[in-house]
Amino acid sequence: MPQGGYLAFYENPAEGFADLRGEEAWVGFQGGPFRYYLIPGPLEEALARYVRLTGLPPMPPRWVLGFHYARWGLRTREEVEERVAGFLERGLPLRAVHLDIDYMRGYRVFTVDEDRYPDLEGLVRAFREKGVRTVLLLDPGVKAEKGFPPYEEGLREGLFCRLPSGEVVRGPVWPGLAAFPDFTDPKVRAWWGEKLAGFLRMGVAGFWLDMNEPALFAAWGEPTLPPSARHALEGQGGDHRLAHNLYGLLMARASWEGFRKHAPQGRPFLLTRAGHAGVQRYAWAWTGDVESTWEGLKATLRALLGLSLSGVYFVGSDIGGFSGNPSPELYLRWFQMAALTPFFRLHAARWTKRREPWRLGEEVL
């Protein structure tokens, strides 16, 4: 091997195992192709060649590099307006607000709760006039409810993952039992992209793709689709053992292609929780639900560096951690770190204390 080292990329989405201890390295996969690339050279050169192989990230919208605000648990339009006003009235830069699942009707994807979020289009427009873009969360699970149009379409057109018996896979997530689009099928990706058109016409500036490992609420077993779930896999066919790691990547691809089709004049912004090699072609990433502790901050730094070394350069975290109540010092240090990352967002769980900067005292502000 060359003196400068090398980068090894195994092009296999199946579950893998690696043992890098000692003098030898061992890598194995539970199925899939045995196809790999060895890229020699110093780290920066090898990484550049890897990114050219898996795909370069596109130029982002300029506003995305500014400060973003989000919070799970903003139950009404008025709560969101109050938070945005709090930043603007204090002269604190705010470029985007992210709406979590609270804006949906019963957590049904592609819906808006008109009672709690009336005239969402007007809200998006009002924020835009103040220089604040709106980003909406989307989950892949489609509520398995008779009469719900996306579910009925999915059944009629064969868009959902199925068991070997032919039965649609259903699993518990936010709206209750849900079915899961098979993003390994080009037909499904096109359908999903069409579903974004209405939001884009409203002026929505980006989408936050969550729960797309895909994740399920499971009391036991793996919190995802069963290994036997069937996927199209671009016409080759196969089960979830090959499709699992591709699911988030292909949901991002479907969203990107829909964005480009229905808002061709703009640069898409997508944020994803899950992905695979090449996801940087479509989406940014954040580190997910990290605990609000010093160890959580250290783990976040490791994750951000690891993502960057995997070609996913546009990354960030939930400032202060997602779950818990950071001390003023931890909050401030996390903020300082996050200001140097491409994705700069304050976000937290609904059970945590409010943590807008002015809530933690004058010294922090």
Annotate the PLM regions.
Residues M1-L365:
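Catalytic-domain carbohydrate-binding cleft regions of carbohydrate-active enzymes
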